[in-house]
Amino acid sequence: MDTETEFDRILLFEQIRQDAENTYKSNPLDADNLTRWGGVLLELSQFHSISDAKQMIQEAITKFEEALLIDPKKDEAVWCIGNAYTSFAFLTPDETEAKHNFDLATQFFQQAVDEQPDNTHYLKSLEMTAKAPQLHAEAYKQGLGSQPMGRVEAPAPPSSKAVKNKKSSDAKYDAMGWVILAIGVVAWISFAKANVPVSPPR
């Protein structure tokens, strides 16, 4: 992704975050807005250092939990919490702590599936989170933990070691791609819901 596109995405997500914050001031009981706010915080976390990203993910979880206090059956917020814990786990180098977060993610994905058993996103998330600890281990073996979020380093010239490690590298990109895709879907759904025109009362 080029720098200009990345900058445009940051501006878009920051605007959505500000809109959600303003909506919250006028209507703190809007569960959709809280879910949208949490989703955009997850998106923005990609563009920050690991410590800042973890803090933003924690803040996103707080927004999702607040949405669930208002609407306990809000399956989208439940699914988003699963995504947040998955993202947090991938940013955590300690395997025990990461596994704890993956376990939490699994619980929330299962709860979302229980609420909406036919939702393919929820089912896929539950399926993928079972593979996440292995992807996490592979990613950290390849040095993912030292790379800043939202940036991809230029590849080194091919060598026999690079060819040998291609499978491990693919696992790393599969894991991060899945996390980023899930966050993107959440933000897109939330943004789409925010811009649905309200029909006038009859």
Curated annotation (Swiss-Prot):
Residues 193-202 are mitochondrial intermembrane. Residues 146-166 are annotated as: Disordered. TPR repeats lie at residues 38-74, 86-119. It holds the Pfam family TOM20_plant. Keywords: Acetylation, Membrane, Mitochondrion, Mitochondrion outer membrane, Protein transport, Repeat, TPR repeat, Transmembrane, Transmembrane helix, Transport. It is found in: Mitochondrion outer membrane. Coiled coil: none annotated. GO terms for molecular function: protein-transporting ATPase activity. Its main location: mitochondrion. It is a single-pass membrane protein. Forms part of the preprotein translocase complex of the outer mitochondrial membrane (TOM complex) which consists of at least 6 different proteins (TOM5, TOM6, TOM7, TOM20, TOM22/TOM9 and TOM40). Component of a mitochondrial large protein complex that contains, at least, MIC60, DGS1, TOM40, TOM20 proteins, and petC/RISP. Central component of the receptor complex responsible for the recognition and translocation of cytosolically synthesized mitochondrial preproteins. Together with TOM22 functions as the transit peptide receptor at the surface of the mitochondrion outer membrane and facilitates the movement of preproteins into the translocation pore. Belongs to the Tom20 family. This is Mitochondrial import receptor subunit TOM20-3.
